[in-house]
């Protein structure tokens, strides 16, 4: 009997760094987590300290090993998944960042984006990167650092500076500066990567004044990039063998590796990704085209849509309206009534995301009558999350021409059985909830394990993807269509609110 080996996933998120150790049956053996500082230098700006990201991430690996009594020489490989778009620029000679990491949420580069739009680059960005010209993505963040940090542009042009998303920074640190790489999924979120030719886009680098020498080499999401001694005693060298951005790692962890397979992560917002296989689909409905992973970690195309308010709308019921003590109580109260009594809640608190992209829409409750109570409003709020998910999935199916096979789900809100059943009814599609909901870490671990032969094939992994529950649609077509029509009317009310204000003026 050979000694038990394990895979570790490093999950570097927006608020914390985690290490998750898995065994051969994909059971979680040990988890360690450390939060780190959120830095807000001014309104709309968000930063992290790259050295703190590194310190918290490396210490979680040591801690996860110590907690479980697993030795470093029992690790078959390390997989990395990370918050996407967050941008780090560092000096390759000193290993020191020239500025804090500029986080994906940071809006400081809005003016740079407007300038690029005025130069007619919007269509070029959409056609070649699959993205919209927005401060969310890495490209304008790199330009900002080069333009605003003293000496940065000169050093960059002299070949002294390197750029990376968080995955690149971690691999560079773990290999003592020997390896400067990223994977296709992270590269596709920079707004600097051509997803048609699968290479850095020279025109966009030139337009933003970014030297090509700063860019990491782009590799598949499943291969050995280098080896590390991190957490290792003496000469133990552990292969770093998997990299994927968090949403793409979740897509892979859910085994959505073929065209038409999709997942929804129900967090603060909702992140929907649909694998479209080897065919690049350009959205006509405000979705992003991005790169994901095929069965062997090779690049595949995907459509991505985000809903701004998912679980956050339940927090609003708890914190602001105070009609819930805990978010988990929402299921109990929603099932105290048979219907939402004609009420629709459109949680457009910060506008509407895909497929509407209406920054001026505002939250709306419509259909109120004297018989409506707090349970109806709680139920309608949960239903609103499911309707928004249908809005995005309808757009994905229209864009791709691919019928959704089923919806795989993960994230905190999937514990809510009422929401999951209603989601199935609204979509007229099966909803699959996995037993292990740590799908982001699973995805990174699977990619790493396949690269080193820890698992032999995607088929072996499919067998490990045990479902906790399958929700099947119950509604008849007439009822489903009538409800959804009502939702569309409610959304129109949310969108008309600001237009009416303009007319009053």
Swiss-Prot record:
SUPFAM superfamilies the UniProt entry points to: Actin-like ATPase domain (SSF53067)
| Gene3D superfamilies per the UniProt record, alphabetical | 3.30.420.40
| Pathway involvement of the protein, from the record | Polyol metabolism; glycerol degradation via glycerol kinase pathway; sn-glycerol 3-phosphate from glycerol: step 1/1
- Its domain of life reads Bacteria
List positions binding ATP: 14-16, 268, 311, 315, 412
Per the UniProt entry, the Enzyme Commission number(s) are 2.7.1.30
- Give the CDD domains listed for this entry: FGGY_EcGK_like (cd07786)
Which InterPro entries does this UniProt record tie to the protein?
ATPase_NBD (IPR043129), Carb_kinase_FGGY (IPR000577), Carb_kinase_FGGY_CS (IPR018483), FGGY_C (IPR018485), FGGY_N (IPR018484), Glycerol_kin (IPR005999)
What modulates its activity? Inhibited by fructose 1,6-bisphosphate (FBP).
Annotated GO CC locations: cytosol
Q: What does this protein do?
A: Key enzyme in the regulation of glycerol uptake and metabolism. Catalyzes the phosphorylation of glycerol to yield sn-glycerol 3-phosphate.
Q: What is this protein called?
A: Glycerol kinase
Q: Which gene encodes it?
A: glpK
């Amino acid at each position: 009997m050979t000694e038990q080996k394990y895979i570790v996933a490093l999950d570097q998120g927006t608020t914390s760094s985690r290490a998750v150790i898995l065994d051969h049956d994909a059971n979680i053996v040990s988890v360690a987590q450390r939060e780190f500082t959120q830095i807000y230098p001014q309104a709309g700006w968000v930063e992290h300290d790259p050295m703190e990201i590194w310190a918290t991430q490396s210490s979680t690996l040591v801690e996860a090993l110590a907690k479980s009594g697993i030795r470093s020489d029992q690790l078959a490989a390390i997989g990395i998944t990370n918050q996407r778009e967050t941008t780090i620029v560092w000096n390759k000679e000193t290993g020191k960042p020239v500025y804090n990491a500029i986080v994906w949420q940071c809006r400081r580069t809005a003016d740079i984006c407007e300038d690029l739009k005025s130069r007619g680059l919007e269509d070029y960005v959409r056609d070649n990167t699959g993205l919209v010209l927005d401060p969310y993505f890495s490209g304008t963040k790199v330009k900002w650092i080069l333009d605003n940090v003293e000496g940065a542009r000169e050093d960059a042009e002299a070949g002294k500076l390197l750029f990376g998303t968080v995955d690149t920074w971690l691999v560079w640190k773990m290999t003592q500066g020997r390896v400067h790489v990223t994977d296709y999924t992270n590269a596709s979120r920079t707004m600097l990567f051509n997803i048609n030719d699968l290479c850095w886009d020279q025109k966009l680098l030139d337009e933003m004044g970014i030297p090509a020498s700063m860019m990491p080499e782009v590799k598949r999401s499943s291969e050995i990039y280098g080896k590390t001694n991190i957490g290792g005693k003496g000469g133990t060298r552990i292969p770093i063998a998997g990299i994927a951005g968090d949403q793409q790692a979740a897509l892979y962890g859910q085994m959505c590796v073929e065209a038409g397979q999709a997942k929804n992560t129900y967090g603060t917002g909702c992140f929907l990704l649909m694998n479209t296989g080897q065919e690049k689909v350009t959205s006509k409905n405000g979705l992003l085209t991005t790169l994901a992973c095929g069965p062997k970690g090779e690049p595949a195309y995907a459509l991505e849509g985000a809903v701004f308010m998912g679980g956050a709308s339940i927090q609003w019921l708890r914190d602001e309206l105070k009609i819930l003590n805990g978010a988990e109580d929402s299921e109990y109260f929603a099932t105290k009534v048979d219907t939402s009594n004609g009420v629709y809640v459109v949680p457009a608190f910060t506008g509407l995301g895909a497929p509407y992209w209406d920054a001026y829409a505002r939250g709306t409750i419509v259909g109120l009558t004297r018989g409506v109570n707090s349970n109806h409003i709680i139920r309608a709020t949960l239903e609103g999350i499911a309707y928004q998910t249908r809005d995005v999935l309808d757009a994905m199916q229209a864009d791709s021409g691919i019928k959704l096979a089923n919806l795989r789900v993960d994230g905190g809100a999937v514990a809510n059985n009422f929401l999951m059943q209603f989601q199935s009814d609204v979509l007229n599609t099966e909803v699959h909830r996995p037993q292990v909901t740590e799908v982001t870490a699973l995805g990174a671990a699977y990619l790493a394990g396949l690269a080193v032969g820890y698992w032999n094939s995607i088929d072996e992994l499919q067998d490990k993807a045990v479902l906790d529950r399958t929700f099947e649609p119950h509604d008849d077509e007439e009822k489903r269509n009538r409800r959804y029509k009502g939702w569309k009317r409610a959304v129109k009310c949310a969108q008309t609110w600001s237009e009416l204000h303009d007319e009053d003026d």
